[in-house]
Design a protein with these regions (language model features):
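Auxiliary alpha/beta "docking" domains used to position bulky ligands
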Residues: 1-181
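Iron-sulfur cluster-binding cysteine motifs and their immediate structural context
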Residues: 187-212
Length: 213
């Protein structure tokens, strides 16, 4: 692509398609600390039964290996907060994100429309299934910060949203990360129904227990 798109142009178009948050990060290998933590997490079986998270590690740690010519990563978020709470049936309830149409299809369609509307013809659309550290790039793109719930928190939106990315082959103006605003709050830990989250006195770098989540 020869035409340089501005950061603001990208955001306006993304929000017109229903993405309530959008930011852009430069495509590089993830920092060494993150890469080391991810490998250690896998080594300690932190991913539980999610074996796919141990696949394509090189691509997960460097999006330039996932998409040749990658220069920028456009990160977007789509809200999935339900209009009403799902009633419990016995001990179980359907997770809110699983209600309705398959979100992969909906978001992929929106990503392709975003690319088309912006005149981008060389890109890779990612939504959940691609080997990319979505939360890491969302932080780099200034969407939010990683909270004590180990999820991305977007200001005024919490953590109930889907993340998706367009990896593109052009540079633009990049957003800056947001400083964590959790402070002394640990409401997520107190309200975790399965105990998957660590207590606030524990090492914050220890991931939550995926097998309990």
């Amino acid at each position: 692509m020869n035409v340089r798109l501005s950061n603001e142009t990208i955001k306006v178009e993304a929000k017109s398609l229903g993405f309530f948050a959008c930011g852009v990060a430069q495509a590089n290998r993830v920092d060494d600390v993150t890469a080391c933590k991810y490998r250690d997490w896998l080594s300690s079986s932190g991913h539980a039964s999610m074996a796919y998270l141990s696949e394509n590690i090189d691509k997960r740690l460097d999006p330039r290996l996932l998409f040749e010519g990658a220069k920028s990563i456009i990160c977007v978020a789509l809200n999935y907060t339900p209009q009403k709470k799902t009633p419990l049936k016995g001990e179980f309830a359907i997770a809110s994100y699983a209600l309705g149409q398959d979100y992969h299809d909906i978001i992929k369609s929106k990503l392709h429309r975003l690319a088309a509307n912006l005149g981008i013809d060389n890109y890779k659309a990612c939504c959940d299934t691609a080997p990319i550290l979505e939360r890491y790039w969302a932080v780099r793109a200034g969407l939010g910060w990683i909270g004590k719930n180990h999820q991305l928190i977007i200001p005024h939106a919490g953590s109930m949203f889907f993340l998706a990315e367009l990896i593109v082959d052009f540079e633009t103006d990049y957003d800056k990360p947001i400083v964590c605003r959790c402070g002394n709050c640990h409401a997520c830990i107190d309200n975790c129904p399965t105990g998957a989250l660590k207590s606030p006195d524990d090492n914050p770098d220890i991931p939550f227990d995926s097998s309990l989540c």
